[in-house]
């Protein structure tokens, strides 16, 4: 995305992100999924360029995620797995040889409702995201940042219910 200086001036004046601002700047959430750079030019020639840190913007755009339960939650014997990845293009759960697509909510949380048979299985999240340093979309295979259990080598998360004694 390219933006002009008028857009930047008005956007930088905003100190909080509320619904009115989201309506006024509807493309900001999409812009954050790709490369963002600020370039200074003189006489049409670029003289400086830098990337942009977006962490604070994400917190402002997705305040509802603060109250979400992330990681594994249980509804009886059924697990629900949730991951906050607001800039991801796609997220899936690697469960053995299966790759299961997660659904993105408006607050940037990706969710997958599981099955009772998943208890005790190892998993990884596959997160497709644009990486500025390599200028392309890459798939990161990661353990769950909210893991309550890991495999012995710590290479995968485990779907575990710590309230069930036989899981220990």
Describe these PLM feature segments:
Residues 84-90, 118:
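Short proline/glycine-enriched turn/loop motifs at strand-loop junctions of beta-rich domains
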Residues 91-93, 123:
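Short beta-strand elements bearing conserved aromatic residues within extracellular beta-rich modules
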Residues 2-76, 80, 99, 105-168:
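The feature marks proteins involved in alpha-glucan
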Residues 96:
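Extended, well-structured beta-strand/loop surface patches
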């Amino acid at each position: 995305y390219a933006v002009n200086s008028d857009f930047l001036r008005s956007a930088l004046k905003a100190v909080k992100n509320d619904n009115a601002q989201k309506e006024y700047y509807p493309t900001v959430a999409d812009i954050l999924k790709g490369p963002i750079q600020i370039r200074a030019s003189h006489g049409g020639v670029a003289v400086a360029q830098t990337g942009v840190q977006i962490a604070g913007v994400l917190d402002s755009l997705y305040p509802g995620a603060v109250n979400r339960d992330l990681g594994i939650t249980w509804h009886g014997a059924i697990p629900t797995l949730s991951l906050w990845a607001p800039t991801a293009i796609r997220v899936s759960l690697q469960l053995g040889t299966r790759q299961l697509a997660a659904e993105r909510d408006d607050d940037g949380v990706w969710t997958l409702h599981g099955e009772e048979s998943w208890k005790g299985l190892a998993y990884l999240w596959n997160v497709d995201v644009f990486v500025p340093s390599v200028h392309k979309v890459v798939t990161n295979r990661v353990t769950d940042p909210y893991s309550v259990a890991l495999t012995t080598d710590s290479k995968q998360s485990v779907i575990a219910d710590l309230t069930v004694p036989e899981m220990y």
